[in-house]
C-alpha cells in the first residue's frame, strides 16, 4: 500500500481544483532522443503517463524509451528552484505543485520504483507547464476576449526541453524562451521593486473638493503618508493639514508617474490613484506580465507601437524611437481592439463611410430629430444601386438599406488622412476634425479607431524613404481634395496593445485601467 501512495497522490493532484488536464495536439515533429546518464533509472508504466491526458508528456517519455530521466540531482535541483521562485516572474509556484514535488525530493533516496516514476512524471509535466507559461502565458487571450487579435505563439516544448537537457543547459532554456522585449524586462523590475515596499496600512483618502497649493484640508495627512510611502516625497514631514510647496512638488511627481496632468491639483483622478494599495498595484504588474507573454517575444526592426491606456504612439526604427504622438482611443463601450499587424497604405483626403454601430447609436436618432443632420455634416446617402437619396426620401425604418459617405475635407471625421493595416475589426489610424482633444488628459473618446496627433508629419515620415515626399507634395494632394492612396514601401509592424504598468529608472509607472481588464485578468490567473 505504501508503495503506491505517491501514485495515488498524483491522480488526486491531477483532478484537484477542478482543473482540466492540459490536452496538447499531437506533436508531428519528431522529438529528439533523450540522452540518459548512469543515475538510477526505472521503467515507467504508460498508464501512469496517461493519467495526465497529455500527448506532449507521452511523446516526451517515448523519447526516453519510457524510462525516468531526472536521476541527476543537479538537474532536479535546478527545476525545483525554477518552480519555487516562479513568483519572481509573477507566477504561482503551487500552479506547478511545488510543495508536492519537494515532498518527493525529500524522500528520493528511499522511493520505490513506482513512486520514483511518479515523481519523474510529475516533475516533467510541471516543468513543461512552467516553460509554456513563461513563453506564451498561462491563459489564452482569444478565449478571454473577442477583440484581441494576436497571432498564436507556437512552442515545441519537448524539443526545446530535450535539447537543453541533453546539453546540460536547462538554465539557457529558461532564459532564452522568455520575452526579449524591453517592457517585459521593465515589468519584471517593477515586480522586484514593489516587493521591496513594506505592507501599507494607510487609510483610504476621502476628499470631496479639489485641493490646491496652500489649502488646508484634513485629507492631506493621509495624502502625505501615501506620498512618503511611494517615495514621491522624501525626508520627514510634520503631516500637517496644510498643502505646502514640498507636498505640491511630490504630488506632481506622483501625477507624472501615473499619467495624470502634473499640475499639482489634487482632484478625483489623483485621489483614486493614491488610494491604490501595494497589493493592488502588485496584482496590476502581474496581470501586465501575463499580457506581455501573449505579445510577440521579439519586435520587428521597424514598428508603430500604441499603448492604449497611455494614449501614446511611438515609432521605433532600428531600436531608435524616432517619433512620439498623442493618440485618442476607443471608449469603454467602443473599445479599441488589440491587434498585431503591419502598415499597408496611406490614404489622403479619405471619405468616411458611417459604420453600423455609429449608424445605429448616433446617426439614426439624430436623423429622426433633424433630417438635415447628415447634410450638415457633408454626408451623402446612397441606396443599394448607388443612387443618391435625399434626406427627405430616407426611410427611417430601414436605415441599413443605405450607405452613408462623408466627402473628403478638413471637416471629415477621419480628417485629412488615414493609415490602413490588415485587421478583422475595420479599424485604422487616422486624423480627426477635432484636433483640440489631444491636449486633454483622458483621451478615451473614439468609436474604436485610433486618432493620431499631427498625422501629416507622420505620413511624410513613413512615405519619404527615397526623398520623394517633400512637404509641398503632401500639401498639393491635400489641396486637391481628391482621395489618393499610396502604398507604404518600408516595412513597419503595427502593435496596438494594452498595458497599464511598467518601470523606468527604478520608478514604478502606472496608467488608469480604462477598460477595467487588470483585476479580472489577475483573478483568472490565480483561479
Q: What role is predicted for each listed range?
A:
Residues 2-7:
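Sec-dependent signal peptide recognition
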Residues 12-15:
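C-terminal motif of bacterial Sec signal peptides marking the signal peptidase cleavage site
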Residues 17-60, 128, 148, 165-527:
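Well-ordered beta-sheet/strand-loop patches within structured domains
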Residues 17-153:
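Cationic-aromatic interfacial patches
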Residues 155-157:
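Alpha/beta-hydrolase superfamily serine-hydrolase fold, recognizing
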Amino acid at each position: 500500500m505504501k508503495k503506491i501512495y505517491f501514485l495515488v497522490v498524483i491522480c488526486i493532484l491531477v483532478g484537484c481544483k477542478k482543473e482540466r488536464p492540459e490536452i496538447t495536439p499531437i506533436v508531428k515533429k519528431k522529438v529528439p532522443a533523450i540522452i540518459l546518464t548512469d543515475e538510477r533509472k526505472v521503467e515507467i508504466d504508460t498508464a501512469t503517463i496517461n493519467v495526465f491526458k497529455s500527448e506532449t508528456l507521452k511523446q516526451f517519455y517515448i523519447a526516453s524509451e519510457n524510462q525516468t530521466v531526472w536521476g541527476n540531482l543537479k538537474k532536479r535541483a535546478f527545476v525545483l528552484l525554477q518552480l519555487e521562485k516562479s513568483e519572481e516572474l509573477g507566477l504561482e509556484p503551487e500552479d506547478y505543485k511545488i510543495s508536492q514535488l519537494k515532498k518527493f525530493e525529500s524522500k528520493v533516496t528511499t522511493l520505490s520504483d513506482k513512486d520514483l516514476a511518479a515523481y519523474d512524471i510529475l516533475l516533467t509535466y510541471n516543468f513543461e507547464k512552467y516553460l509554456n507559461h513563461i513563453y506564451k502565458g498561462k491563459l489564452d487571450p482569444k478565449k478571454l476576449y473577442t477583440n484581441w487579435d494576436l497571432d498564436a505563439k507556437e512552442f515545441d516544448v519537448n524539443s526545446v526541453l530535450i535539447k537543453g537537457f541533453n546539453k546540460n543547459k536547462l538554465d539557457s532554456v529558461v532564459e532564452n524562451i522568455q520575452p526579449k522585449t524591453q517592457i517585459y524586462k521593465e515589468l519584471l523590475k517593477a515586480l522586484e521593486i514593489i516587493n521591496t515596499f513594506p505592507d501599507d496600512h494607510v487609510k483610504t483618502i476621502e476628499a470631496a473638493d479639489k485641493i490646491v497649493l496652500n489649502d488646508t484640508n484634513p485629507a492631506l495627512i493621509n495624502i502625505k503618508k501615501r506620498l512618503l510611502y511611494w517615495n514621491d516625497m522624501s525626508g520627514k514631514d510634520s503631516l500637517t493639514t496644510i498643502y505646502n510647496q514640498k507636498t505640491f512638488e511630490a504630488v506632481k511627481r506622483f501625477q507624472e508617474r501615473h499619467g495624470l496632468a502634473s499640475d499639482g491639483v489634487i482632484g478625483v483622478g489623483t485621489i483614486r490613484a493614491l488610494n491604490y494599495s501595494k497589493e493592488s498595484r502588485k496584482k496590476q504588474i502581474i496581470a501586465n506580465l501575463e499580457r506581455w507573454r501573449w505579445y510577440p517575444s521579439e519586435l520587428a526592426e521597424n514598428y508603430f507601437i500604441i499603448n492604449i491606456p497611455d494614449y501614446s504612439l511611438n515609432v521605433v526604427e532600428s531600436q531608435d524611437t524616432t517619433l512620439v504622438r498623442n493618440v485618442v482611443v476607443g471608449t469603454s463601450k467602443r473599445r479599441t481592439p488589440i491587434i498585431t499587424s503591419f502598415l499597408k497604405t496611406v490614404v489622403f483626403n479619405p471619405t468616411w463611410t458611417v459604420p453600423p454601430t455609429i449608424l445605429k447609436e448616433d446617426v439614426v436618432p439624430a436623423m429622426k430629430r433633424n433630417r438635415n443632420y447628415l447634410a450638415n455634416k457633408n454626408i451623402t446617402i446612397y441606396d443599394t444601386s448607388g443612387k443618391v437619396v435625399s434626406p427627405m426620401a430616407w426611410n427611417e425604418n430601414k436605415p441599413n438599406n443605405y450607405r452613408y459617405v462623408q466627402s473628403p475635407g478638413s471637416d471629415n471625421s477621419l480628417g485629412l488622412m488615414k493609415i490602413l493595416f490588415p485587421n478583422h475589426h475595420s479599424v485604422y489610424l487616422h486624423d480627426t476634425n477635432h484636433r483640440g482633444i489631444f491636449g486633454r488628459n483622458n483621451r478615451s473618446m473614439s468609436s474604436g479607431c485610433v486618432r493620431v496627433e499631427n498625422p501629416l508629419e507622420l505620413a511624410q515620415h513613413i512615405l519619404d524613404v527615397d526623398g520623394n515626399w517633400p512637404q509641398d507634395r503632401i500639401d498639393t494632394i491635400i489641396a486637391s481634395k481628391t482621395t489618393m492612396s499610396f502604398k507604404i514601401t518600408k516595412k513597419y509592424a503595427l502593435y496596438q496593445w494594452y498595458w497599464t504598468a511598467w518601470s523606468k529608472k527604478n520608478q514604478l509607472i502606472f496608467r488608469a485601467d480604462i477598460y477595467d481588464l487588470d483585476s479580472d485578468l489577475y483573478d483568472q490567473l490565480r483561479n
